[in-house]
Each structure stands twice: as structure tokens, then as C-alpha cells.
């Protein structure tokens, strides 16, 4: 093997692409700053236990690990910047009110994943801490959509979800709260209606019917919300989740060409606590932006704070904008 061949899913970035990426980074960071989001720059490497807290637990298999020759402790190369920004908010800034932060930098993953399907991802994003209201979710979603508009990414398709609906059903049916019965959880994610019906056959009729309904509750936002209110139990948790989705849909109308809701989208269930959103654009199979609510992410750092935010992949955006230049 030639010594200069790069590892799989790791690439050099050549001048034309590098210039597009840098222009995008500057435009987006200026856009964030103008809306009150302050820039932070976490380190590339941290103690592993710090990286794998909150959302970080789901990233353990994605994290490159090494031994620190100075301390002998296990270190990790960041696979996502969200846990690091949460640490900064909770442990270093310690602000009592709402905190708005943004970031941009490389993350490294053991397996190709994320929005660009590379192992090194040029991540940029924004986080809002200290506000548990729907208004905060609306602000972050609005910032994501306006950011894409600022870099001339058009023809957007928005998918909304909310883990609170499944969590309310699992609690009501007395299924384990850590993801529920794993077979049922997986069947819901794959929308396997016959298997969901089989696995819930012994539940009380109201809960059984609700789980079965969940496999069909995806599609245009207005249709899904109407069907969900008709077919799901009228509990405060479910009503609140649907109201949140309704408000987010109102925020996005006019900024996207298509607006869908999927109530069986359980991506990130183990750390998400509320609404999630994924943005797609015409001609791109993968999402170009993702966001979610993850309250309590700073608990491991001494302060459990409401949090919501989103991330984008600069290299993916550069590829999209490069098509039109």
C-alpha cells in the first residue's frame, strides 16, 4: 500500500472546495452572531468520560480512543460537538438565564456516518440553553431554516417528530421507559404494523390500538396531526407533544416546500426529550440539517438545563452550493 493513501472515508479538501467551505462557515457564523449566538471552540480531544455524557453515550462506538501519555487516562477524539458545548454551558459559563452558543469544527468518527457519510465531518451548529418553552424550539428551527436560506439552499423539505408521543404510550402501557420492549421499539421504527399488532395483542385495547396507529401516523403535517388527535389517547403528554408539532409546523410554513410529520421516528430516543426535525433538499438523499430537544444534557456537568439545537455539515453544504455556481 502506498504510504500516502488516506484512510477510507477520509479526504483531502482541495482549494476550490476549501474556499466554498470557508465562505459558508463565515456566512453562517455571522448569521448566528447577528441573532445573539456566541461562538465557542471546544478542544478536539477530551477525557473520554466527559465526551460520553448526555447525548455522548450514543456516540461511544463512534469515538476514537487513545491513552494520554501524560496522565495515563483514556481520551476520546470528539465525534460530536454537542456534549462539549453542553459542558461549556453547564460547567464554565454557569449563566442563569437563556444562553445561545454556536460552534464550527471537525469531528472524527470510527464509521462513516452523519449528513455527508464521511468519517471526518465539518460540523457547524447552534444551541439554545435554559428555555424549555415551545418558543425556543421555534427559534432554533427558524434559525436553521434562515441559515439555509442565507447560503442559498432552496427547495427544502422538513420532517418533524416527537419522542414524547412514544414515551407517553410506553408509560401508559407500563412498558420499560428506557426504550420500551426492544422488539416493539424496533418494529415501530420500521413501521411493521403486523408485528406491532402481534407484540401489543395483550395490552388493553386503547394502548394496543394507539401503538398500531403509530405505525401509520406519518405524512403531510396537517393530516397526521388530525389523525393523531383522533386515534391516540387524549393524555396531557400526547396533547402537549402534538401542540408543539403544530406550532413548529406553523413556524416552517412558507419556508419549506413540503412539511411532514413522522410519529414513529424514534431516532435519538435515548437522549431526545421532545421535538426533532430533519431538513432535506431536492436531489439529496440524506438530511442536510438535523435538530432536536435534549433537556437535562448538562446534568452530568452539574446543571441540568433545557436545551435545543441543530447541526449542519459544511462539506455537504459546499457540495450543494457548488452545484449552482
Pin down the residues of each PLM region.
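Positively charged, Gly/Ser-enriched RNA/tRNA-binding surfaces
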Residues: 17-35, 46-47, 82-153, 200-325
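Short, solvent-exposed helix-helix connector turns and helix-capping sites enriched
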Residues: 162, 191-192, 220
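Beta-rich nucleic-acid/ligand-interaction surfaces
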Residues: 42-60, 161-171, 265-273
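Cap/lid and interdomain-hinge subdomains that line or gate substrate/regulatory clefts
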Residues: 132, 136, 159, 189-190, ...
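Residue-level detector of family-conserved "landmark" positions at structurally sensitive sites
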Residues: 42-43, 158-161, 180, 259-262
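Acidic, His- and aromatic-enriched active-site or binding-groove loops in soluble protein domains
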Residues: 62-70, 175-199, 203-204
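Extended alpha-helical scaffolds
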Residues: 151-155, 163-166, 176-179
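TRNA-binding/sensing appendages of the translation machinery
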Residues: 1-83, 138
